[in-house]
């Protein structure tokens, strides 16, 4: 490891770093950019440590994030490795361990969604979720590029093969079929209405379908339908007929690309300082869909270099799945090292291709088309957003000379003081930063006191977090005063521009008024781009707050009715809800059905029924 410590005799930072770079070897390895307090700002890998680190200081830097990084570098540490592959693996391990702020390449790095068949015997469950949790035992299918695609597949599986989707706790406590059985989306294995052998057939058919083997299912269903008819078991024959009908409908709607194979097809494009990457997911020869990413990279760098950075970030930090093939629009400069690193990390080989034919060429063309279309749309949105930030700067010229890049906005949501939630949304000139969004559950205040709620949220936020360039409050002078009070108490009042946006006359949208601490209010025209920006951010804060509030309120209301019933503790409340499958089903239960739940009995059942129906 090579580094320059705080006690270095070279006091000037620039001179110290230059001295360090001169001593770096032309060998592969990993470098860590450190801040003034020794905190890790960025981790990178290099084929040649000396050349790569020197590039940060030997050229004009166009990308604002890289400029900001270089300005904060106080020290550099390096670790030499035996190969470029080893450097890549070490880089990703360090990024996962330290989460450096300047290594955030993807704003949306949620894990992909998978359909999951549990290992529970004899009645496995069908579900979906993000990532492959180590605590879950079973088979995973996917990944699916969107929640819509995963849910659509799950609903389809339910209709066709009727596997259960309930939790194991719910399943074990059932005494009668639930609503899913009534609407023909489950065969009620919980109460023995389907044999383990018949259910196993449904499981096997589900697995075949998810693997793309629908033709085998088609043949098997025809045989079973005919056999059931010959045995005069017409109920089963009708069941298999309905499955066949749905299967044929699905086969007719399947993607054009029906060859076998699994691949991630990845295309990159850059324009106007913005880069877009499209990841097209192909499994079982079917195109499951695609997702567009806009990585925070320097667009002046070669496309292939940025694609390499994206791929390592994507496969090591976002997805849990490595297909047999990765098809790329551009050849990577370190393609062999990337391939070896992925194989080591996932424990399976992958073939990376850039020259493809026939169906694979069609997949790649589709990925390129999606990339270019998404880039064009995003660029238009970005230019509009950039124009709005410029308009805001012009409007605020008389108020501040501060550069406005990061804006944080707060809102409070409740229903007559119930389930109060505070929200914080974050925007910069690249758009919303959803990773930085936060929701705050408000406690220990008088219900309906918006001022106390805002004070609590701001105090909790800025006790730990740095201030943005602009702090936007949804509300009038009163809320602005609360924000001023909080920042004063924290000793950071002058470190940000504080604005509240209030509804104008008649509380009509478009008549908003901006309030400041040391300046007269601003009444902007309805066509003002600056006003449109602030209204958009304010509305997003409101949406984020009210969504969380409704979820909390509804959850509380569904359980609060049961909480007032004497003799009905937490365990019995949970048993009731699990037995009937939710509050709505519980409300529809008779007194006798309530008494049949273990631990309830006729006396308590009478009380529960009375409270629920008064």
Curated annotation (Swiss-Prot):
Instruction: Enumerate the Pfam families for this protein.
Output: GIY-YIG, HHH_2, UVR, UvrC_RNaseH, UvrC_RNaseH_dom
Keyword DNA damage recorded: yes
- Superkingdom as given in the UniProt entry: Bacteria
Which InterPro entries does the UniProt entry name for this protein? DisA/LigA_HHH (IPR041663), GIY-YIG_endonuc (IPR000305), GIY-YIG_endonuc_sf (IPR035901), GIY-YIG_UvrC_Cho (IPR047296), Hlx-hairpin-Hlx_DNA-bd_motif (IPR003583), RuvA_2-like (IPR010994), UVR_dom (IPR001943), UVR_dom_sf (IPR036876)
Instruction: Please give the chief subcellular localization of this protein.
Output: cytoplasm
Question: Which SUPFAM superfamilies would you find in this protein's record?
Answer: C-terminal UvrC-binding domain of UvrB, GIY-YIG endonuclease, RuvA domain 2-like
GO CC term, one of those recorded:
cytoplasm
Q: Name one GO biological process term.
A: SOS response
Keyword tags: Cytoplasm, DNA damage, DNA excision, DNA repair, Excision nuclease, SOS response
Q: Which GO terms describe its molecular function?
A: DNA binding; excinuclease ABC activity
Compartments where located: Cytoplasm
Q: Where is the UVR domain?
A: 215-250
**Residue span(s) of domain GIY-YIG:** 26-104
What family does the database annotate? Belongs to the UvrC family.
Task: Note the subunit structure.
Answer: Interacts with UvrB in an incision complex.
Q: Say what the protein does.
A: The UvrABC repair system catalyzes the recognition and processing of DNA lesions. UvrC both incises the 5' and 3' sides of the lesion. The N-terminal half is responsible for the 3' incision and the C-terminal half is responsible for the 5' incision.
This protein is called what? UvrABC system protein C
Could you tell me which species this protein originates from? Psychrobacter cryohalolentis (strain ATCC BAA-1226 / DSM 17306 / VKM B-2378 / K5)
Q: What is the lineage of its organism?
A: Bacteria, Pseudomonadati, Pseudomonadota, Gammaproteobacteria, Moraxellales
Name of the gene encoding the protein in the UniProt record: uvrC
């Amino acid at each position: 490891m090579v580094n320059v410590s705080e006690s270095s005799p070279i006091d000037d930072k620039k001179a110290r770093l230059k001295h360090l770079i001169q001593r770096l070897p032309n060998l592969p390895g990993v470098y860590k950019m450190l801040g003034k307090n020794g905190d890790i700002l960025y981790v990178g890998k290099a084929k040649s440590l000396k050349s790569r680190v020197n590039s940060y200081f030997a050229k004009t830097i166009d990308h604002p994030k890289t400029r900001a990084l270089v300005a904060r570098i106080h020290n550099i540490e390096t670790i030499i490795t035996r190969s470029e592959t080893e450097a890549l693996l070490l880089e990703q391990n360090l990024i996962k361990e330290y989460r450096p702020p300047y290594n955030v390449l993807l704003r949306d790095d949620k894990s992909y969604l998978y359909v999951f068949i549990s290992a529970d015997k004899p009645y496995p469950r069908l579900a979906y979720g993000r990532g492959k949790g180590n605590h879950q035992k079973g088979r995973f299918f996917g990944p699916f590029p969107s929640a819509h695609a995963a849910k659509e597949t799950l609903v389809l599986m339910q209709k066709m093969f009727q596997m259960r989707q309930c939790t194991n706790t719910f399943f074990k406590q059932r005494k009668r079929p639930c609503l899913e059985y009534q609407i023909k989306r489950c065969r009620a294995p919980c109460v023995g209405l389907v044999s383990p052998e018949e259910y196993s057939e449904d499981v096997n058919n589900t697995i075949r379908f998810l693997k793309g083997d629908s033709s085998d299912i088609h043949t098997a269903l025809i045989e079973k339908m005919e056999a059931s008819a010959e045995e005069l078991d017409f109920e089963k024959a009708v069941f298999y007929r309905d499955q066949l009908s749905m299967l044929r409908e699905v086969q007719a709607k399947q993607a054009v690309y029906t060859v076998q194979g699994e691949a991630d097809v990845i295309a990159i494009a850059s324009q106007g300082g913005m880069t877009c990457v499209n990841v097209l997911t192909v499994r079982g020869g079917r195109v499951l869909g695609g997702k567009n990413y806009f990585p925070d990279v320097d667009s002046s760098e070669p496309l292939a270099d940025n694609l390499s950075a994206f791929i390592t970030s994507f496969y090591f930090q976002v997805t849990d799945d490595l297909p047999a093939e990765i098809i790329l629009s551009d050849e990577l400069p370190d393609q062999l090292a990337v391939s070896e690193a992925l194989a080591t990390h996932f424990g399976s080989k992958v073939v990376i291709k850039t020259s493809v034919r026939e169906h694979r060429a069609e997949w790649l063309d589709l990925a390129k088309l999606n990339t270019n279309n998404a880039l064009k749309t995003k660029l238009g949105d970005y230019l509009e957003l950039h124009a709005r930030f410029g308009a805001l700067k012009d409007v605020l010229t008389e108020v501040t000379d501060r550069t406005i890049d990061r804006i944080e906005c707060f809102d409070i949501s409740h229903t007559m003081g119930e389930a109060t939630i505070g929200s914080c949304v974050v925007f910069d000139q690249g758009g919303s930063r959803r990773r930085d969004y936060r929701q705050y559950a408000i406690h220990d205040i008088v219900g309906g006191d918006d001022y106390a709620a805002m004070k609590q949220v701001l105090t909790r936020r800025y006790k730990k977090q740095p201030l943005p360039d602009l702090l936007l409050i949804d509300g009038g002078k009163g809320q602005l005063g609360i924000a001023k009070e909080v920042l004063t108490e924290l000793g950071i009042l002058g470190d940000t521009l504080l604005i509240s946006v209030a509804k104008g006359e008649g509380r009509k949208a478009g008549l908003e008024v901006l309030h400041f601490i040391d300046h007269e209010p601003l009444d902007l025209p309805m066509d003002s781009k600056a006003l449109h920006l602030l209204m958009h951010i304010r509305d997003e804060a409101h949406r984020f707050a009210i969504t969380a509030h409704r979820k909390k309120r509804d959850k509380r209301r569904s359980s609060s009715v049961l909480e007032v019933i004497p003799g009905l503790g937490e365990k019995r409340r949970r048993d009731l809800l699990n037995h009937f499958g939710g509050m709505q089903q519980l409300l529809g239960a008779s007194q006798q059905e309530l008494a049949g739940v273990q631990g309830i009995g006729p006396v308590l059942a009478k009380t529960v029924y009375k409270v629920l129906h008064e």
